[in-house]
Amino acid sequence: MKRYIITGCSRSGTSVTHNALKGHPNVSALNDEVLIEPYFNMGLSTFTHGRNLKIENEKGFQAIFDGICSIGANEDTEYIGLKTSLYYYPIYAKYVTSALEKYFPNIKVIITYRKDTVAQYGSWIRARKTGQYHSWNKKDKKLLHPIKLNKYQYIKQLLDNLDFMEELRNLNLTHDVLEFSYEDDICKGNFYKLFDFLKIPYYELDWLNSKKVAPSPKKYIKNYN
């Protein structure tokens, strides 16, 4: 079975992209998001005291990946994969790229990104305030009054995200990479690009029941402009 990974900055569409692939009949993917730390910087040492043999370290990353991502695999499975998103710590992007470059030379990489960085930051703040991070978590219907973003915190996250994306885009030099846009692909339903990238058959995404929960950014971000 072949491997893929979905990664990108937080609130850039990693989850809906993950769900679009996870439901495909030829894909087996771990349901939840994988923590960057400890897996991507420690590998097998996540479970040991670190006294691993060289061959264990070399094969440990792949063994863990294959083990957790193939739980739902069957005779139709062609790809196994996972998703992880970047937030808070700029070193996290380096953990991901280093692991992929060293241990996963043939993995397919899907990078999500968002052009509207104000909306991206506002989405993160709104999710934290409401506790509702995804549109398929319908148990929490709390509404949020319009919010005002802290421009200094926004600038910090913007700079962090630029660093994240610069590091991730280095993978274009070593891997087969698809950049998947929130505005141009996700919002327009262009999920066929994911299937084309992995060379798997196209299916109508009847398993994708996500609906937009938040109003448009201009409606709930007071200082959007």
List the model feature ranges, each with a label.
Residues M1, R51-K54, I80-T84, Y152-Q153:
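N-terminal start-of-chain detector that recognizes signal peptides
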Residues T84-Y202:
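PAPS-dependent sulfotransferase catalytic domain
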Residues I221-N225:
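Charge-rich, low-complexity intrinsically disordered segments
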Residues R3-I5, E78-G81, V177-L178:
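Residue-level preference for the first positions of well-ordered beta-strands
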Residues K22-H24, N74-D76, F104, N172-T174:
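Short, well-ordered coil/turn elements that cap or connect secondary structure elements
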